């Protein structure tokens, strides 16, 4: 590991994230105004595509960070078997899962069963495919459905809170299988599929339309669901968030778009792949 990632092992990750969460949720005029304006300036945030176009229109930093897009700001690919990006961001990695292994960064992989925190689910997706989308601070931070499906289970997995970026992906072993995350499992036209929302340093929380805001616990927490979604529907959001990983079964026979590769910039709803079913 380099110095940046080594230091993160020794800082109180949970305490830092807890404090960040309290500040981000504060509605105190000075606190919210200072955080929102400083963040918008630091990351050159434009509100042109958003429903509320004044920095003063937000009730807290969290409200600003999870700001909603204007209607029709994103076009959802309508192809029947198309699989779309769940978020605005950058393709960190994508491709096939080979014998349970997903690519994290060049020369570094990790186990699908560990990511999903379930060995049976890991076996099911052992030779499937995946796409990892990293959400930068300036991006739209809501996560949407990459396919039509019925949510059947959520699994909260406690973990570390390393920051997520190219440096940590290259240096922290099993980064996505170690960080706090929420696994969402769906029944789809091509079998079971998953969307994994991965937390990171100072991520103040993860919320979905099915679960509400997730409460941090020391143990894995599972819940059964029966909620149908259409491609492009909002699934959840990050409060100072991180990464979304789409996991597809072998039966989907995923064919990735030639333009989609490591480092590609994507928007929510943009076509990533087609399922050949």
From Swiss-Prot:
Keywords: Cell membrane, Decarboxylase, Lipid biosynthesis, Lipid metabolism, Lyase, Membrane, Phospholipid biosynthesis, Phospholipid metabolism, Pyruvate, Zymogen. It catalyses: a 1,2-diacyl-sn-glycero-3-phospho-L-serine + H(+) = a 1,2-diacyl-sn-glycero-3-phosphoethanolamine + CO2. Binds 1 pyruvoyl group covalently per subunit. Catalyzes the formation of phosphatidylethanolamine (PtdEtn) from phosphatidylserine (PtdSer). GO terms for molecular function: phosphatidylserine decarboxylase activity. HAMAP family: PS_decarb_PSD_B_type1. It is a peripheral membrane protein. InterPro entries: PS_Dcarbxylase, PSD-B, PSD_type1_pro. Belongs to the phosphatidylserine decarboxylase family. PSD-B subfamily. Prokaryotic type I sub-subfamily. Its EC number is 4.1.1.65. It is an enzyme of class 4 (lyase). Heterodimer of a large membrane-associated beta subunit and a small pyruvoyl-containing alpha subunit. The record marks 241-242 as: Cleavage (non-hydrolytic). Its main location: membrane. GO terms for biological process: phosphatidylethanolamine biosynthetic process. The active site is at residues 88, 144, 242. Its cofactor is pyruvate. It is found in: Cell membrane. The keyword Nuclease does not apply. This is Phosphatidylserine decarboxylase proenzyme. The modification Pyruvic acid (Ser) is found at residue 242. GO terms for cellular component: plasma membrane. Pathway: Phospholipid metabolism; phosphatidylethanolamine biosynthesis; phosphatidylethanolamine from CDP-diacylglycerol: step 2/2. Is synthesized initially as an inactive proenzyme. Formation of the active enzyme involves a self-maturation process in which the active site pyruvoyl group is generated from an internal serine residue via an autocatalytic post-translational modification. Two non-identical subunits are generated from the proenzyme in this reaction, and the pyruvate is formed at the N-terminus of the alpha chain, which is derived from the carboxyl end of the proenzyme.
């Amino acid at each position: 590991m380099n110095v940046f990632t080594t230091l993160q092992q020794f800082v109180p990750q949970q305490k830092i994230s807890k404090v960040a969460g309290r500040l981000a949720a504060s509605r105190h005029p000075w606190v919210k105004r200072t955080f929102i304006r400083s963040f918008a300036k630091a990351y050159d945030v434009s509100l042109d595509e958003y429903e509320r176009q004044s920095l003063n229109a937000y009730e807290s930093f969290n409200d600003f960070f999870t700001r909603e897009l204007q209607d029709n700001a994103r076009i959802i690919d309508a192809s029947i078997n198309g699989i779309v990006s769940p978020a605005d961001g950058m393709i960190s990695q994508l491709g096939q899962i080979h014998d349970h292994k997903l690519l994290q960064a060049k020369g570094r992989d990790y186990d699908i069963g560990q990511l999903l925190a379930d060995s049976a689910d890991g076996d099911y997706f052992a030779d499937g495919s995946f796409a990892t989308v990293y959400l930068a601070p300036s991006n739209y931070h809501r996560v949407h459905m990459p396919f039509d499906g019925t949510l059947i289970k959520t699994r909260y997995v406690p973990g570390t809170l390393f920051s997520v970026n190219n440096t940590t992906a290259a240096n922290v072993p099993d980064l996505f299988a170690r960080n706090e995350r929420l696994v969402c499992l769906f029944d789809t036209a091509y079998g079971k599929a998953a969307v994994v929302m991965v937390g990171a340093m100072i991520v103040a929380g993860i919320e979905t339309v099915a679960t509400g805001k997730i409460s941090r616990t020391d143990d894995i927490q599972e819940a059964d669901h029966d909620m149908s979604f259409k491609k492009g529907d909002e699934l959840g959001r990050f409060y100072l968030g991180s990464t979304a990983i789409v996991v597809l079964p072998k039966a989907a026979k995923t064919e990735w778009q030639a333009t989609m590769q490591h480092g590609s910039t994507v928007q929510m709803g943009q076509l990533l792949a087609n399922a050949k079913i």
